[in-house]
Amino acid sequence: MVLKANQLRHSYGRREVLRGVTFEVPPGALVGVVGENGAGKTTLLRILCGELAPAGGTTELDGRLGYCPQQVVLNDAFTVAQHLEFFQVAYGLADLSYAYELMEVLNFADYLHDRVSVLSGGTRQKLNLTIALMHDPEVLLLDEPYQGFDWETYLRFWDLARQVRARGRSVLVISHLAYDAERLDELHRLDEGVLHTSTTIHEGRC
């Protein structure tokens, strides 16, 4: 177990958005949580990453965490390189070699010295993902990670996810769509705050 949620509950006013959510993310796995808008997916992810305290229940994390939120949080005045240098210090990294490798995989290395203000939404999301991964976390939490991606970049994303899994890392993908199910090792469905029995997709390992 790399990440575990145990009986998580949360409410906004009288509206209960998480109702005793319990599940585990095993090592070296691609895990998906799908559900309609308003099902509680983003709230769940915010609790798992420590951004939001649950009203009830606990989480357990074994190792480093990477988090790629749905809303890209970048500074328009900074270049891509400046963002990487900032997080190099924040993560305590000796160098940026893995970050540069991620940029090559995601095909945006040519934008290294461009300011974020001139980047497209898809390229911003690539930078967001690179920042979440550049310290090689044991578990990566992704909230609708491929929004704004074209088809080629979408495929590159899944290639990267498989590479991360091959390194023994775990990836948890939150999405409102289930058409990526065949790419996942486990799939959970969140419906009105209730997490339904997971499905193990053995043939989905790619």
Question: What is the predicted function of each stretch?
Answer:
Residues 49:
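Helix-to-loop junction immediately C-terminal to a conserved catalytic motif
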